[in-house]
Amino acid sequence: MISPYFVPRKRVGALRSYKFAKHLKDLDWQVCVVHLEVKGQKLSDEEKLALEGVELFELKTPFDRTINRSSSDLGEVDPHISNHMESCNLTETQSQSNTSITKYKIPLPNRSEYIPEDQEKKEEGMRAKKDIVQVGAPIQRVIDRFECYFPMDTWYPLLRSHLNYMEQILIQEKPNLLWVTADPWSGLSVIRTLSKRLGVPFVVDFRDPFTLCPIRSAKKSNWAKKVEKNLEVKVIQEAAAIVFTADETLKLYQESYALHADKMHLIHNAFDYDFLNSSAQLDQNMELEQNNELFRETNKLSAFIDSSANRDRTSTSEGSSKSEPFKLLFLGKFRSSSPIEPLIKSFLVIKKNHSTFFSNIRLYHIGTLENQVQKELENLGLTRQFISLSPIPYDRVPDFIENFDGLISLLNPIRNMVIPSKFWDYLPATPPIISIGTNLEMKEILTNTQRGYQFESFQTEEIAQKLYELQVQRGSFSLKSGTSKKHLNRIVRFSAKHKTRELSDLFLSVIKN
């Protein structure tokens, strides 16, 4: 496996490779992984145990700016809450926890408008680090500008410099098959060279669209686009198989490269924990879990949610169950690929039609909002409804999301060929999913598993009404009591074990042919 991004890095692509590696090992594959080193981070005890028997080879890096700036990094970030925040309980508890994962600060511009004065004083010691982030911003802008004219990505020179070392690894290990993840994209060029040198077939995990991605292509110069298109054509011609993570992406490439459509396959991303076992025994195991360090840390993460909810209850009538805050979670950052606008418009509909419910609804999201968005929320009277959280450590996500009444998935209509990674974290959970987007495959999965509902971004009236209905009937939904066995089985099909079996079958078919 040539997987430049791999654990302990917590990018989506790194976690996909990690899940495959550990489960392929259980299917009697001898797995070797070549990956970029992650400075300052180490494998967790759980990761070490899962990867026993898997050979790991690190590629040295002089520096790495992707660890703390990637929007797809799911690692632990030192917690701060922006926007509507009246307590620093979460910050205090997380900062006391011991972890081997490097912590990074989230820059919080213009926070004085949203943070109480006493909270500002408690954060005096952090301002020097904020300044460091600001100083680095011009450098990053220069790098981003350079990447517009650079084909693939700026990892290519480094990976190219390690070609001979990677070749020596392959000569030593004598693999039957090479597998590469296109994260970063420069891995595609590397795998072609290695395959030719050793005569070993290769499988490419494209995951998302490469040159056919409208958002990515818009950021590249015409020259860079031509180079990338030429590389993509050659990779598709030479690869033994190509894997995508969404049906829309698969169809897009099968139409564009019809002569090679038969070598293209769909293997979704997946969740990676035995939710059926934990769901069925959740009540019985509660006392045991509370003695578990991981569970205690998760409770620390949710402490802010609970304390915030308690404060909100005091502002409404205590006797009514409808006075309880209705908590939604968007396990991501608002950006062009996951726009905030549909939620703003839906909340305005709720404000107009259901004033009591509006006063109780809260949406927790990862990261800070842009200044322009913060001002818009303030002008519309929505600042109390949107609450920022720090990124949640990946291994604590399953327990953390159970604190909420609903889970939000957002997808820009022009990116309907992909499925957001957070969707797979939501799927085996208990709270219902509200998907806002146009990906038909997601809608089909939600329908077949009875896990939620999908709306297009303009359906703000319908979104508002569904949220109101969920608030009225919350507590009646449960994977244990309200979901039939056949629907549970449909959810299990998207587990990492099942998806790895699909990948294993594909590998065997390539080797036999």
Set out the residue ranges of the language-model regions.
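N-terminal subdomain of nucleotide-sugar transferases
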Residues: 1-88, 92, 96-115, 241, ...
